[in-house]
Amino acid sequence: MTLQISAQVVKALRDKTGAGMMDCKKALQANNGNEEKALESLRQKGLASANKKSNRTAIEGLLESYIHTGGRIGVLVEVNCETDFVARRPEFQKLAKDIAMQIAASPNVEYVSTQDIPSEIINLEQRVEAGKDDLKNKPVDRIETIIEGRMKKRLKELSLLDQMFIRNQDISIEDLINQNIAVLGENIKIRRFVRFLLGGGEENLKVNFADEVADILNKK
């Protein structure tokens, strides 16, 4: 006998993952109604689909821009897919807009992924961490472990794909892209981006800009 899952539970899982209603229902039924296990299975399904398509050429897509209210911060991002047909799909266009707004709200992000971070930047960050006062008088093996953990965290701060999606803190931007790969059936890549800030540094802003962008996203 097939396990009956309420529409409310299915919708809650869809809101968390972005997967289709039927996919969410099947995942819940396959996992005896356990939402966490169903969520994990959907993520694995999206990742498997993404891995199958990751080597396929993605040269279509669009350039998406976002200018925040007041013109203080602007973003231009190139998001690629395989065909012009998918580039015109509302789901793909929404993804590109969400990514642009994510970049606007992420002042520390400088690269698409950790693999894009130049070795000289990594070496510089390692020297900075190694020179911090709180590491003095600690055993050498302990210092290496601390630096490794801090470096992993720091490199993720610089990587767009490792950021938690401001509209859904349960998934990363990489998860978001993988979900859309599963839905749209094509390889999707963030090719490059640039973030502009009027007048210089973030310290000149008098508001929590990430919260502002999150509010705008959640109202859409």
Curated annotation (Swiss-Prot):
GO terms for cellular component: chloroplast; mitochondrion. Coiled coil: none annotated. Keywords: Chloroplast, Elongation factor, Plastid, Protein biosynthesis. PROSITE patterns: EF_TS_1, EF_TS_2. It is found in: Plastid, Chloroplast. One of its GO terms (molecular function) is translation elongation factor activity. Associates with the EF-Tu.GDP complex and induces the exchange of GDP to GTP. It remains bound to the aminoacyl-tRNA.EF-Tu.GTP complex up to the GTP hydrolysis stage on the ribosome. Belongs to the EF-Ts family. This is Elongation factor Ts, chloroplastic.
